[in-house]
Amino acid sequence: LGSGAIFFTIRPLIDFGAVGPVGTSWPSMEEIERNWPGFRGPGGLGISAYTNVPVKWNGKTAEGILWKTEVPLPGKNSPVVWEDRVFLSGGDPNGLQVFCYDTASGKLLWKKDLTSADLKSEEEPFEVMEDTGFAAPTVMTDGRRVYAIFATGDIGCFDFEGNKVWEKSLGVPDNVYGYASSPTMYRNLLLIQYDQGSAEEEKSNLIALDGFSGQIVWQTKRPVSNSWSSPIMV
């Protein structure tokens, strides 16, 4: 998704009953499989559990389109969906934001800012490649919170009402093309592939953050240079 608008298509209605963004500390596999929690959906496979969905779209005639709404800031990421919420992120030289929309209507429910010292530094403006921009990674949700990471290395966690749970900086990544890896989750762990620099510099890491607090649980060196893939759980 670049900038401008988000489109949403019609799908069969599922009754989620009492399942909501509260309850257990992390979602069950059944919850994950009937939502779209991160980049390329459940397990990063690009496979949806839904059937009888539109296979044709036309922005001019509205064929296959339920609604369309503006996105406040540009981002190269993809939308994620959890029941009645759609999440996106965006950014420009003036700020980094996370957005939440109503699945049924496309109404913007909230937008929240992250604080980035690196972005707002007066000494040297933060520069990004046009192909990646400030918000290339797709956000991740566990059905209780939503997590977003940006080109600056800043990570923000918000609950479903838009309250900031925590914010953390991993430092500006040394990545010539810009940071674009989307996070994934295992139970309460937010897994971040943070590749940067050259292989000889040994700057690249796989990092696990506690989804509740943002604290680093563990990190493992990766013998690679800067790259742009995203981790998946198998």
Across the structure, where does each feature detected by a protein language model lie?
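Noncatalytic, solvent-exposed loop/strand surfaces
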Residues: 1-234
